[in-house]
Structure formats: C-alpha cells, structure tokens
Swiss-Prot record:
Family to which the UniProt record says this protein belongs: Belongs to the eukaryotic ribosomal protein eL24 family.
Cited CDD domains: Ribosomal_L24e_L24
Composition bias type Low complexity, residue spans: 124-133
Gene field: RpL24
Species, as recorded: Plutella xylostella (Diamondback moth)
GO cellular component, one term: cytosolic large ribosomal subunit
Name assigned to this protein: Large ribosomal subunit protein eL24
Biological processes annotated in GO: cytoplasmic translation
Region (Disordered): 92-155
Gene3D superfamilies linked to this entry: 6.10.250.1270, Ribosomal protein L24e
Highest taxon above the source species: Eukaryota
Length: 155
C-alpha cells in the first residue's frame, strides 16, 4: 500500500483518495482534497496557512513531547602548571597575604628603577659629545589654491 504526500498541505494521502494535477511542463502535484487544490491554485503560501504541516514545522508546533531539550556541557576548571612556573609556585603566590605581596611588588619596582638609572648613567658616559645644535631645515611654504568663485546665488 503506497501512501503519498499532499503537495500543498503535507498530509498523508491514502489509496483511493486525493487528486493529481499534471501541468504542461510535466510537474505532478498530488492534493489531498479540493481545499488544498484551491489554495494551491490561488497561490497561497502553505507556510502562512495555519493548518498545513509546513506552517506547523515553521513555528515548531507539537514537537515538545518528541524532542527532549538539549543538555549543554558545563565547563570545568582545572589547575595546572604554566611554562616557567610550577603549580606549587602558583599556589604559594595565590595563598600569600596581601601585605607581603605589596611589599614584594614595591621592592621589585625599586630594583627595576635602580637598574634603569644605572643603564642610563652608563649610556651617558659612553655617548660622544655633540658639536652643538644643527640648524633646522627651512620648510617650503605651501602654495594654497584660491577657492573657485561661487556661482548661482543663494542656496
């Protein structure tokens, strides 16, 4: 027993029912009843007609019991070592008291400043003395074009 589908509504057509329309270009349309055929001939969009299968699919009608809601995977946190720091070092820094951390930071900043100062001083001593300021180059004056005269009076 062959069960067909309606070209307009999408409902099943059982043997002995329905009507087949063949167009001049050779396209076959099988309709469940005259209601479907008339709607097709009036060029009604089956996605906008509420009782068709296409409409029900478009607006997700009657699918709640069939499909369970998809479960999303929760992200999990892992603690692992980074290149240049072992996990124990990271945990020790994390568990450090804020006062100790602040003192360490200030000490590191002080050290960096001293190092910068020493490198700057060494550069100063090795740099050759300059013979005074070089004369600045004279810039060429820009030639500005005069605006074209306005024509046509007030706008």
């Amino acid at each position: 027993m062959k069960i067909g589908l309606c070209a307009y509504s999408g409902y099943k057509i059982y043997p002995g029912h329905g009507k087949t329309m063949v167009k001049v270009d050779g396209k076959n349309f099988t309709f469940l009843n005259s209601k479907c055929e008339a709607a097709h001939l009036m060029r009604r969009n089956p996605r906008k007609v509420t009782w068709t299968v296409l409409y029900r699919r478009k607006f997700k009608k009657g699918q709640e019991e069939e499909q369970a809601k998809k479960r999303t995977r929760r992200t999990q946190k892992y603690q692992r070592a980074i290149v240049g720091a072992s996990l124990s070092d990271i945990m020790a820094k994390r568990n450090m008291k804020p006062e100790v951390r602040k003192a360490q930071r200030e000490q590191a900043i002080k050290q960096a400043k001293e190092q910068k100062k020493s490198t700057k001083a060494s550069k100063k001593t090795t740099a050759p003395p300059t013979k005074g300021k070089a004369a600045p180059k004279a810039k060429a004056a820009k030639v500005s074009q005069k605006a074209a005269p306005r024509v046509g009076g007030k706008r």
